[in-house]
Regions:
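Bacterial N-terminal signal peptides
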Residues: 8-15
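C-terminal helix-cap and adjacent tail motif
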Residues: 43-45, 218-251
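Positively charged n-region of N-terminal signal peptides that target proteins for export
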Residues: 1-4
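Short coil/turn connectors at secondary-structure junctions
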Residues: 148-151, 217-219
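N-terminal amphipathic, basic helical "cap/leader" segment at the start of enzyme domains
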Residues: 22-149, 245-251
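Phosphate/pyrophosphate-binding betaalpha-module
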Residues: 195, 214-217
C-alpha cells in the first residue's frame, strides 16, 4: 500500500512539473489583420473635350515621366476605361457566363501603395500600403518608366476560367481581352493629356509576387501612366513616317 502511495505522489509531481513547463500562449503573434482600405472612386466622366479621332492621332508612347502623383479622379477614370466600361459592354452578350465576364483584374501601383480595382463597386481595395514601384521596375526592361510614372497598372488574366470550354484558345482569348483593356486605358490617358506606354517585357513570376496577384491569375501587361516630361522619350506614327533610310553603296 505504501508503495502505491509513493508511486502516486511521484506521478502527481511529474504531472505538475510538466504543466508548469508548458509555454504560455504567444498572444503577440495573434494580432488582428488590419482592415482593408476601400476607396470609393468618383463617377467617371462620359463626355470629354477630345474626339476619338484626335485621341488616335495624338496617341504616342511616353517612356519618361515627371514622377508627379496622379489625382484619384484620374485613376478612377483610367480604371473605368480599362474594365468597368468593357464589362458593361460584355454583359449585353450571352456568349460568356457571369464568371467568365471577369477574365481580367487590374492592379494599381501608386505612391500610396498597391490597390486592386473592383469594377462592380467602382472602388479600389488596398492590398499593400507600401510603394512597390521601385521593386516592380527591377522585374521589367523599362525601369525608369515604371519608377517615374504617376501610376503603374498591372493587367492580369485568369486563363483557367475559359480553359474548360475553349481549351487551346483560352490563352488567345484572354490576351485579346487584355489588349482591349490596354488600348482603352492608353486612349483614355491621351484624352486626359497624360502620357502612357505599355510594357510586356517583364518577369511574370517576379511581377506576380511583387504585386501580390491572386492565385490563378497571370500578369499580361503593365501600363505606365503619368505626366510626360518636355524631353520624354516618345515615338509616334508621324515620327516613324518622317524617317528615311539611306543606303550608301560603294562605287
Amino acid at each position: 500500500m505504501k508503495r502505491f502511495t509513493i508511486l502516486g505522489i511521484i506521478l502527481i509531481c511529474f504531472a505538475a512539473l510538466c504543466f508548469g513547463q508548458r509555454r504560455p500562449r504567444d498572444t503577440s503573434r495573434r494580432t488582428r489583420s488590419a482592415p482593408k482600405k476601400i476607396i470609393q472612386l468618383t463617377e467617371p466622366k462620359l463626355m470629354g473635350t477630345m474626339s476619338f479621332e484626335e485621341a488616335l492621332s495624338n496617341r504616342k508612347n511616353i517612356r519618361v515621366f515627371t514622377g508627379e502623383t496622379l489625382q484619384l479622379s484620374q485613376i478612377g477614370q483610367l480604371a473605368w476605361a480599362g474594365q468597368r466600361a468593357t464589362m458593361a459592354q460584355r454583359e449585353l452578350s450571352t456568349i460568356l457566363s457571369t464568371e467568365e465576364l471577369n477574365l481580367l483584374e487590374l492592379y494599381f501601383a501608386t505612391e500610396e501603395g498597391l490597390f486592386k480595382y473592383r469594377p462592380t463597386e467602382h472602388t479600389l481595395e488596398q492590398i499593400y500600403d507600401q510603394d512597390i514601384r521601385s521593386e516592380l521596375s527591377l522585374a521589367t526592361s523599362m525601369q525608369e518608366t515604371i519608377s517615374t510614372a504617376g501610376c503603374d497598372i498591372i493587367v492580369a488574366g485568369n486563363i483557367r476560367r475559359l480553359a474548360s470550354r475553349m481549351r487551346t484558345r483560352a490563352r488567345t482569348y484572354t490576351a485579346l481581352e487584355a489588349g482591349y483593356t490596354t488600348q482603352n486605358i492608353l486612349l483614355q490617358a491621351v484624352s486626359m493629356d497624360l502620357g502612357a506606354t505599355k510594357i510586356i517585357d517583364f518577369n511574370s513570376k517576379d511581377v506576380g509576387r511583387i504585386c501580390r496577384i491572386s492565385r490563378g491569375l497571370e500578369p499580361i501587361c503593365i501600363i505606365s501612366v503619368g505626366y510626360p516630361t518636355n524631353q520624354g522619350d516618345t515615338e509616334t506614327r508621324q515620327d516613324a513616317k518622317n524617317k528615311r533610310a539611306v543606303f550608301i553603296v560603294p562605287s
